């Protein structure tokens, strides 16, 4: 039975998360995994090449060695195990799932805020603080998007939650009430 990508990512990331937590190396492991993610994102063919059975084993291992060389023992073991089981194409998924676990532990929420005009740093900070309080997060990481159709106000989207305080939505609601 073949496991799907999400299942593989959850299993490997949970095992690594538990191990790093137990060994009090969660922060350093997290930092290392972020760097590993950047390597795979900067070299999109790397995971495919490391999984490519048509390449000689020596060639694949030559690609693998720099990753292992700079890794701490637990991350090195993860990389080696993922490679040995032919799951290198799942590496970024594993790191992404680890990020989810890490963010849950640290009560970090990622949100996108949409406004009609560019927000200042102060406005972003205010939105982060208000939203963090509303959802019980310790930290909110905002990305912002400008959409003139919003007219005014803000729309905040995070995971499965949308808070729409835009003028566009208020006008549409008023229109619906007037037409009813």
Curated annotation (Swiss-Prot):
Subcellular localization, as worded in the UniProt entry: Cell membrane
InterPro entries assigned to the protein according to its UniProt record, in alphabetical order: ATP_synth_OSCP/delta_N_sf (IPR026015), ATPase_OSCP/dsu (IPR000711)
Keyword hit for Membrane: yes
Predominant location: membrane
Keywords: ATP synthesis, Cell membrane, CF(1), Hydrogen ion transport, Ion transport, Membrane, Transport
Cross-referenced Gene3D superfamilies: N-terminal domain of the delta subunit of the F1F0-ATP synthase
Pfam families in UniProt: OSCP
Lipid bilayer topology: Peripheral membrane protein
GO terms assigned for molecular function: proton-transporting ATP synthase activity, rotational mechanism
Family named by the database record: Belongs to the ATPase delta chain family.
Subunit structure: F-type ATPases have 2 components, F(1) - the catalytic core - and F(0) - the membrane proton channel. F(1) has five subunits: alpha(3), beta(3), gamma(1), delta(1), epsilon(1). F(0) has three main subunits: a(1), b(2) and c(10-14). The alpha and beta chains form an alternating ring which encloses part of the gamma chain. F(1) is attached to F(0) by a central stalk formed by the gamma and epsilon chains, while a peripheral stalk is formed by the delta and b chains.
Protein function: F(1)F(0) ATP synthase produces ATP from ADP in the presence of a proton or sodium gradient. F-type ATPases consist of two structural domains, F(1) containing the extramembraneous catalytic core and F(0) containing the membrane proton channel, linked together by a central stalk and a peripheral stalk. During catalysis, ATP synthesis in the catalytic domain of F(1) is coupled via a rotary mechanism of the central stalk subunits to proton translocation.
Protein name: ATP synthase subunit delta
């Amino acid at each position: 039975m073949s496991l799907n990508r999400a299942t593989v990512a959850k299993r490997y990331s949970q095992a690594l998360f538990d191990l790093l937590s137990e060994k009090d190396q969660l922060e350093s492991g997290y930092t290392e995994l972020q760097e590993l993610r950047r390597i795979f994102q900067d070299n999109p063919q790397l995971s495919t090449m490391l999984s490519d059975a048509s390449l000689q084993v020596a060639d694949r291992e030559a690609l693998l060695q720099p990753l292992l060389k700079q890794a701490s023992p637990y991350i090195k073991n993860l990389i080696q195990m993922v490679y040995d089981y032919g799951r290198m194409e799942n590496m970024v998924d594993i790191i992404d799932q680890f990020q989810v676990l890490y963010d849950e532990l640290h009560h970090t929420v990622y949100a996108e805020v949409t406004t009609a005009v560019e927000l200042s740093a102060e406005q972003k900070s205010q939105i982060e603080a208000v939203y963090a309080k509303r959802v019980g997060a310790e930290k909110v990481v905002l990305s912002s998007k400008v959409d003139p159709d919003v007219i005014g106000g803000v729309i905040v989207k995070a995971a499965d939650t949308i808070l729409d305080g835009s003028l566009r939505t208020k006008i549409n609601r008023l229109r619906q009430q007037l037409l009813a």
